[in-house]
């Protein structure tokens, strides 16, 4: 397991992490506790400085005691810890999202704010292979395409997030802690099937593992293949878009589409000269990348395929709606994308 962590830190499975500061998201569970210990043991070898951040979401009566346990643990290691207490129910109401999403957003906002140098330092989370399997299945349920179906990134440079344990099984983390005589906390809400993630964990994954005891190994292989493909397509689409003619903020024959305070994005044109001769697979990935740059919201495969079919057939004036108030219009062989808030990657 130390080899896995060191491989990440040396850049074998992501951008190298040396001579920097890492802020560890410490819930007190087995995964984040093991992560903090491993990085603590490797800190001198890798030139790391460490701090931790614990969030009390205020949703359970045990949470205050868990925060105190995190303080005691970090004090014993000599690692600075920041504890934040939130009222997630109130945040969920203000943001008009579920409590799980509100807690996640608040956590990552606090972690990002804790980075001493956002351009050089890292947020480290304890996501493990079981979490990756849940993420893959939830993406499948939501209709994600390839290669996003492969699951969350191990290394997310744009958001400065590193998940060093992502390819490690949870039982190995628990065995590691047990060998050291280190205890951890169990969140009682993890036993509830209220959330989709827990239903995957308790119901679906055990069935798949019963059918194939190597299911988690297959998830690991799928992740690796997906991220090889993702790296290829990100490089390919970026090169294609950078070579395309500059996108106008106003398209002749259409209503003006300059920067809009409500949407935050100008029109982006994919000209016919760029699209002609490309394989359908590359066109679809260009569409997805343009939509991603224009803001949040998953592009449904059905709509992407319909847009591509309209372009191939030359059906000018055809308009397609995408999540996040974004549109795509076929006009004179070009495709004009409009609207949408500024882009932000998802975890």
Curated annotation (Swiss-Prot):
One of its GO terms (molecular function) is tRNA(Ile)-lysidine synthase activity. Keywords: ATP-binding, Cytoplasm, Ligase, Nucleotide-binding, tRNA processing. It is an enzyme of class 6 (ligase). SUPFAM superfamilies: Adenine nucleotide alpha hydrolases-like. It holds the Pfam family ATP_bind_3. Residues 243-263 are annotated as: Disordered. ATP binds at residues 27-32. Gene3D superfamilies: HUPs. One of its GO terms (biological process) is tRNA modification. Its EC number is 6.3.4.19. Its main location: cytoplasm. The N-terminal region contains the highly conserved SGGXDS motif, predicted to be a P-loop motif involved in ATP binding. Ligates lysine onto the cytidine present at position 34 of the AUA codon-specific tRNA(Ile) that contains the anticodon CAU, in an ATP-dependent manner. Cytidine is converted to lysidine, thus changing the amino acid specificity of the tRNA from methionine to isoleucine. Belongs to the tRNA(Ile)-lysidine synthase family. This is tRNA(Ile)-lysidine synthase. It comes from Nitratidesulfovibrio vulgaris (strain ATCC 29579 / DSM 644 / CCUG 34227 / NCIMB 8303 / VKM B-1760 / Hildenborough). The gene is tilS.
């Amino acid at each position: 397991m130390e080899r896995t962590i060191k491989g990440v830190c040396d850049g074998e499975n992501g951008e190298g992490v040396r001579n920097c500061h890492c802020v560890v998201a410490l819930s007190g569970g087995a995964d984040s506790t093991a992560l903090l210990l491993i990085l603590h043991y490797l800190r001198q070898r890798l030139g790391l400085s460490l701090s931790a951040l614990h969030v009390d979401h205020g949703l359970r009566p045990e949470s205050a005691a868990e925060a105190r346990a995190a303080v005691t643990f970090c004090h014993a290691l000599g690692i600075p810890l920041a504890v934040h207490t939130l009222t997630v129910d109130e945040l969920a109401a203000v943001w008009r999202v579920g409590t799980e999403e509100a807690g996640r957003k608040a956590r990552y906002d606090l972690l990002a704010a804790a980075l001493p140098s956002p351009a050089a330092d890292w947020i480290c989370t304890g996501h493990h292979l079981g979490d990756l399997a849940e993420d893959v299945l939830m993406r499948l349920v939501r209709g994600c395409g390839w290669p996003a179906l492969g699951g969350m990134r191990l290394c997310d440079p744009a958001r400065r997030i590193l998940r060093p344990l992502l390819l490690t099984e949870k039982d190995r983390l628990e065995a590691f802690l047990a060998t050291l005589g280190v205890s951890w906390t169990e969140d009682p809400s993890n036993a509830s099937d209220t959330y989709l993630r827990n239903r995957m964990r308790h119901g679906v994954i055990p069935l798949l593992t019963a059918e194939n005891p190597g299911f988690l190994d297959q998830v690991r292989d799928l992740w690796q293949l997906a991220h090889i493909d993702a790296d290829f397509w990100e490089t390919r689409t970026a090169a294609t878009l950078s070579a395309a003619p500059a996108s106008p903020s106003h398209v002749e024959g259409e209503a003006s589409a300059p920067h809009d305070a409500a949407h935050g994005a100008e029109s982006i044109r994919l000209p016919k000269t760029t699209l002609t001769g490309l394989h359908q697979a590359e066109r679809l990935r260009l569409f997805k990348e343009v939509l991603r740059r224009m803001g949040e919201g998953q592009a449904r495969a059905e709509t992407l395929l319909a847009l591509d079919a309209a372009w191939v057939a030359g059906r000018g004036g055809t308009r397609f709606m995408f999540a996040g108030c974004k549109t795509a219009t076929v006009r004179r062989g070009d495709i004009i994308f409009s609207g949408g808030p500024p882009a932000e990657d998802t975890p």
